[in-house]
């Protein structure tokens, strides 16, 4: 199959304009939600909290995307919404979308976000991490984990958000999709 590029948006530049400052992390992941908003996360592997890196989560409103696809001029400054994470926090993997919103796993928390003329944090659930792992002679496991945090993208069911933490030993966590409460 052949693909045709139909949309070209500099998401990082649009997010920097919305924030009013330069981003120190790259665009890491994007996903469309059920309403057609394009969610994004900045980050990278091994975002060490003590290094004070700062990621952002956000979206481009579906109305702007539709306008651009229809060949219309669009003011992205009114259509890009961002949520600046605390210093030391950023995404390290993919993101997912459900009817309830966008689910984004950072190196410290799992978020459910909704697009409501801005980024609405529905819930934020912290999880355990032992940080970056390094293997030594005689270790039974390798330290080859790519991420400081969970190291996976969230998996969604109609009622649950599933992901692994970065504890020792690693655990599979199940969160209630509506509340963010750890249920298993």
Residue spans of the language-model regions?
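Extracytoplasmic/lumenal domain signature
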Residues: 1-26, 31-184
């Amino acid at each position: 199959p052949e693909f045709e590029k139909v949309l070209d948006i500099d998401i990082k530049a649009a997010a920097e304009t919305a924030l009013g400052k330069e981003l120190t992390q790259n665009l890491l992941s994007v996903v469309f939600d059920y309403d057609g908003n394009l969610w994004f996360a900045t980050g990278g592997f091994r975002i060490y909290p003590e290094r004070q890196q700062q990621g952002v989560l956000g979206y481009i409103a579906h109305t702007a995307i539709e306008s651009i696809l229809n060949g219309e001029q669009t003011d992205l400054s009114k259509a890009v919404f961002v949520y600046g994470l605390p210093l030391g926090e950023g995404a390290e993997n993919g993101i997912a979308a459900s009817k309830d919103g966008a689910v984004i796993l950072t190196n410290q928390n799992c978020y459910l976000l909704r697009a409501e003329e801005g980024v609405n944090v529905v819930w934020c659930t912290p999880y355990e991490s032992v940080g970056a792992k390094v293997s030594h002679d005689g270790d039974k496991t390798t330290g080859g984990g790519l991420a400081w945090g969970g190291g996976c993208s969230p998996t969604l069911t109609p009622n649950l958000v599933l992901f692994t933490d970065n504890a020792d030993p690693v655990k599979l966590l199940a969160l209630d999709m509506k509340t963010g409460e750890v249920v298993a």
